[in-house]
Amino acid sequence: MERRGWILHCRAGYEKTLAAEAIAAAATRGVYGYCRARPQSAYVVFEAPAGDAPPLPPPLTFARAGLGLITELTDLPEGRRAEAIAAALPRGLGAAEPWMEHPDSDEGRPLARFCRRFASPARRALKAAGVTSGTPDQRLHLLFPNSRHCFVGLAPSGRWPAGIPRLRMPRNAPSRSVLKLEEALHRLVPEPERPYPGEHAVDLGAAPGGWTWLMRERGTTVTAVDNGPLATEVADDPGVEHHRADAFRFRTRGEVDWLLCDVVDRPQGIARLMLQWLRADRARAAIFNLKLPMRRPLDIVQRTLHDLAAVGAQAQAAQLYHDREEVTVYARRAPSRSSH
């Protein structure tokens, strides 16, 4: 099936940044196109006029989720939307039951009720038309910017709808920052590489202790570095050693498994600090946040990823759902030859 392009979900306000990233990423793969990116819409549509776009977009820092664009439908008739969508799609598409999605924007969130109510009629119509088959391999997505306008996309099953994770705030967690790290572990870190009991982490700028708390939940001991106080439940944990020190000056004597950093500072300074630890073999892996500048945020991300690669680290960055004006980076130092 010819793919017209991609549908990309993002944080509202970052459409222009994501569009630039998508166009550049497509060009490196020999695919040329353009983006429709309306400010504050929380989604971007990349279109390849030649119809030669890959089925799915590559990993993009500023995309929460990406779908292969099948078609766009406008002026859907009220009362017969489901039938109109089913009629526009080929039989035997081989997709699981569809997900109804709306943009995560001020304009899009009021459509949540419509999407919930429309789900059953859409599933019935698509199944009756022979479009969906219940296969678990890929899923149909219907994205509604408004109730009469629909983008139809296809993506592998199992992803979060619209890239929004369904994570619950743990009752005993000291801060909501725990959700940011939890999402990063799910989205950026392959399961075999995630923290496990017996490993040790350093958490720079730890207070009040959200990231430290989550690492302890996973059985990892933690050195928490912050001049400020930790929450009582974190400070009293025997698996936590609190160092009242400056995050930029603290160093360990040996190597640690994990380096964590959610310090509010200039992104260049945070990136430099992470590079120092990884270059000196003080940490095997790092998860850190970069607070984004107002202008050209993609530049600092790409520069950081380039610099990490130069010191032998494999890295990926993402603007998570629980991130705000920031991106989260996961970097892991490649094993040395002597370790094999």
Regions found by a protein language model. Give the residues of each.
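SAM-dependent transferase fold signal centered on methyltransferase-like domains
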Residues: 1-340
